[in-house]
Structure formats: structure tokens, C-alpha cells
């Protein structure tokens, strides 16, 4: 059996193990004793290390911040840094996000590509090297982090308590290797002139704000003007309602990862762009026509700030 045939023969086993990880809701939770990122990430780490144990690897849990599976010998360590925590799920799933679902040649579930699936791919690659007797002059250490999505405190802890890595990569992007990434800016914007009464949209900073609801004061024929303006945008859905002297604007754009904003439509950005000509309703730093990645998680009407 050649290596490609052997990889294929392991696919069912790997998918079964992926299902075990996908079934765990490993979003950032409430810290508890011995569980710095809450119950879910700790449970996912326990299961990930258990799978590695079953495959015959040495495993170590570093205080539920992260853990690792290791093979090989030598003083130098090649690190493979993945993560088991996930971003919030949202409400528009076709399939159960916590159940691995197969549809043709695709599988669906939260974490299948970011980053539970890639962790297992790396683990099974290590298994194949070991089982084929490949002798390495370095150790290979697969690190399973629990906080990549919300600050990478898992890796900060690793650097404090574990051996330094000689080199490494993360299976959390496209192949071939990417040597650098775009930067991010997290900020709070204040405005003296905004007339926004409330604004909510988005659920995580590294994803496009694909839905947004904004409330502003109603004015003569403003509802009709906004409806006409929104009809010419790339929104999937929009609705403007008027009640008790207020306009509620709902917009549904197109979701996309923050690294590929050109593939999505920012609902908050569209509302801002189309409302601005009719009054100083929004003065957020969102790129016009909804191509920016900014998102208003909440709006503080008293302080006039977008958070």
C-alpha cells in the first residue's frame, strides 16, 4: 500500500475522531478553577489529547491552556500550532454546527476547517511518518491551543512553561505556506453628532458583520428614501419600519472572514453609507459600500460610542 492509499484508508477513522471534536462546543466560556477558558475548551483539549493517546503519542496537558502530542527525538523541536477553540456559532446554519455532517465530498460542522480538522490532519500525518519508520533528528510537537480565537493566551502560557520551539508552522490557513498576515485594529469610536438611537450587529471581530439593525429618528419621507437607496445595494435582504417616531433599519449582507472582506458585504457598512447622505446618523470608520470589516457589536447611545 502506498502512502496515498494509506491516507485514504484512514479517512473514516479520522472523520469519526473529527466528529468527537466537533461535538464539543469549545467557545470561550466562563473561567473556572483549572479551566482558564471555561468548560468547553477544556473538554475539547481533553478529547484531543485522548485521541492522540489512542494513536500512541506522548501527550501533555499544560494546565488546560493548551496541550501537545509529540514524536521523534532530538534537542530541537518543530512546532505545529493549532487550536481547538471556536468562534461563536451564529444562527443561520443549515446543519447542526455541533454534529459532523457529510454532504457529498464535504463535511460540515464548527471547527472542521478552523481548526479541529487541520489538527487531526497533522496528527495523522505524524502517525504515518511514525508507522513508516521515518527517523527524525528533531522532535515534532503538535500543540493544541484553547484560546487562539480570543487572544492566544494559550500560546503565551506555553511560552512560559514549556520548551522553546526551534521552528514551526500552523495548519490554520491555505497551502502553501503563508509567511505573513494582514494586521487588525481594534478600536472604540466616538462621535459628537450621531443621531443613532441603537445599533447592533456582528458577533466576532474577525468576521464580516453580515447582519445589522439600526434605529434612528424618523423624518419626513426618510423611510422611502432609505428603501430606495438600499434597493440598489448588494444586500441579500433589508427592511425599514417606522414606529413611534423611529426608523428601524435591518440589513442582511454576505458573511466573509475578515481576511477576505472583498468576498462579503458588510451590513453595518451599507447602512452607514446609505444613511449618511440623509443626515449625520453614522460616523463610524467603516469603508463605504460595506466592504470594511468593522462591526458594531453594540452602540452606547449615552456615550455615543460604537463598541
Feature roles, as predicted:
Residues 1-81, 87-89:
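N-terminal helical capping/dimerization or prosegment-like subdomains
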Residues 54, 77-144, 150, 161-166:
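Active-site metal-coordination/substrate-binding segment of hydrolases
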Residues 60-63, 109, 142-144, 169-171, ...:
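General beta-strand structural signal in soluble alpha/beta enzymes
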Residues 67, 106-107, 247:
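Hydrophobic residues embedded in beta-strands of well-ordered beta-sheets
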Amino acid at each position: 500500500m502506498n502512502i496515498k492509499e494509506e491516507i485514504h484508508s484512514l479517512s473514516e477513522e479520522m472523520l469519526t475522531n473529527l466528529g468527537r471534536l466537533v461535538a464539543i462546543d469549545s467557545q470561550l466560556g466562563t473561567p473556572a478553577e483549572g479551566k482558564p477558558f471555561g468548560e468547553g475548551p477544556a473538554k475539547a483539549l481533553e478529547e484531543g489529547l485522548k485521541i492522540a493517546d489512542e494513536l500512541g503519542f506522548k501527550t501533555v496537558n499544560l494546565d488546560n491552556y493548551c496541550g501537545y502530542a509529540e514524536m521523534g527525538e532530538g534537542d530541537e523541536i518543530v512546532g505545529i500550532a493549532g487550536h481547538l477553540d471556536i468562534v461563536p456559532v451564529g444562527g443561520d446554519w443549515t446543519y447542526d454546527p455541533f454534529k459532523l455532517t457529510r454532504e457529498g465530498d464535504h463535511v460540515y460542522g464548527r471547527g472542521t476547517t478552523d481548526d479541529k480538522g487541520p489538527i487531526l490532519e497533522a496528527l495523522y500525518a505524524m502517525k504515518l511518518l511514525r508507522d513508516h519508520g521515518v527517523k527524525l533528528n528533531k522532535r515534532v510537537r503538535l500543540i493544541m491551543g484553547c484560546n487562539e480565537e480570543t487572544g492566544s493566551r494559550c500560546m503565551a502560557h506555553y511560552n512560559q512553561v514549556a520548551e522553546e520551539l526551534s521552528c514551526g508552522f500552523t495548519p490554520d490557513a491555505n497551502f502553501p505556506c503563508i509567511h505573513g498576515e494582514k494586521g487588525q485594529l481594534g478600536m472604540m469610536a466616538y462621535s459628537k453628532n450621531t443621531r443613532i438611537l441603537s445599533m447592533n450587529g456582528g458577533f466576532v471581530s474577525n468576521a464580516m458583520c453580515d447582519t445589522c439593525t439600526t434605529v434612528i429618528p424618523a423624518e419626513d419621507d426618510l423611510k422611502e428614501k432609505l428603501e430606495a437607496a438600499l434597493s440598489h445595494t448588494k444586500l441579500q435582504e433589508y427592511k425599514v419600519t417606522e414606529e413611534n417616531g423611529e426608523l428601524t433599519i435591518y440589513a442582511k449582507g454576505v458573511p466573509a472572514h475578515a481576511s477576505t472582506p472583498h468576498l462579503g458585504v458588510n451590513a453595518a457598512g451599507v447602512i452607514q453609507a446609505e444613511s449618511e447622505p440623509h443626515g449625520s446618523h453614522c460616523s463610524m470608520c467603516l469603508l463605504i459600500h460595506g466592504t470594511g470589516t468593522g462591526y458594531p457589536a453594540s452602540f452606547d447611545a449615552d456615550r455615543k460610542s460604537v463598541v
